[in-house]
Amino acid sequence: MASDNCKGIVKMGSYFGYAVAVTDINNDGYDDLVVGAPTFMRPGFSGRLEELGKVYVYLQRGPLHLQPAQTHLLGSQVFGRFGTSLAPLGDLNQDGFNDMAIGCPYGGDHQQGLVFIHNGHAGGLKNRPTQVLSGQWASSSFPASFGFALRGNMDIDQNGYPDLIVGAFGLDKAVLYRARPIVRASASLTVQPTMFNQEEKTCSLVKQDKNISVSCASTRFCLEAHGKHLPSHLVFVVEVQLDSAKQNQKESVRRALFLESQQPTLVKTLNLTNGERFCCETKIYLRLIL
């Protein structure tokens, strides 16, 4: 029996409490409570009850004072047993809130099992998963029960980010998912002057052994990347397109080109260190249309 705190209705046979996890989701210094109800049912479009499973989130607002979160998480897989297992993951995306893995061991197209990754926020767990892990590698002849058991919040590979172990008891196997470092990158592009003056031809273009005066402008693009526990060097491939709206138009002519290459596309491979800002300046010119 379980009380649906959203509607105040008692739900019979939902197995409320089958899985329980404790973690400080909203990072307020108080542990919060997450409760799985894997056989929770609700009426479907036809009016018949559908077993979807549900996960309830209770935020601790003070010592021993739990309140229901703004939203609870409802499963999307009929008979998938969403909420059979729960695993706190720590802060996967480094946003200051702790995240949660939720097992749905009979979900998916072939009922092989799914694991949903839900990120935390100030009001509990986000309703939409940011990632869904599937047991497609498992045999289809026997239910794999991928996600029946979960263990997270352990940095197994020592890269500074928590990893996740997923058990599939139908195959007597467990799978390790390593969390990859989070890289936050920002890019900017400026053009000066912002408009071409066709009367001012201050750049020289070499074409067919001839020097041609053309209208030009200076472009400057910058890239910065930073994050926690990153490698010493980060490799980026940067592509800058001029007049990109005409890229997929047949028989269209791009009017702006890069002066050095006389092409509408510039591709550069950049090797940055963590926190470094790299900028590159080049010239573009207005193409002569005869």
Regions found by a protein language model. Name each.
Residues 39-45, 106-110, 171-172:
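Short glycine/acidic-enriched loop and turn motifs that connect beta-strands
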Residues 1-15, 54-81, 119-145, 179-202:
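Blade-edge motifs of beta-propeller repeat domains
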Residues 163, 178-290:
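A structural signal for beta-rich interaction modules in eukaryotic proteins
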Residues 37-39, 43, 223-227:
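Short amphipathic, basic-aromatic surface patches that mediate peripheral association
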Residues 115, 121, 149-190:
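Blade-level signature of beta-propeller repeat domains, shared across WD40, Kelch, NHL, RCC1
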Residues 33-37, 99-103, 164-167:
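Hydrophobic beta-strand segments that make up the repeating blades of beta-propeller
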Residues 18, 51-55, 113-115, 172:
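Repetitive beta-architecture junctions, highlighting loop-to-beta-strand starts
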Residues 18-27, 83-94, 103, 147-156, ...:
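Beta-propeller blade termini
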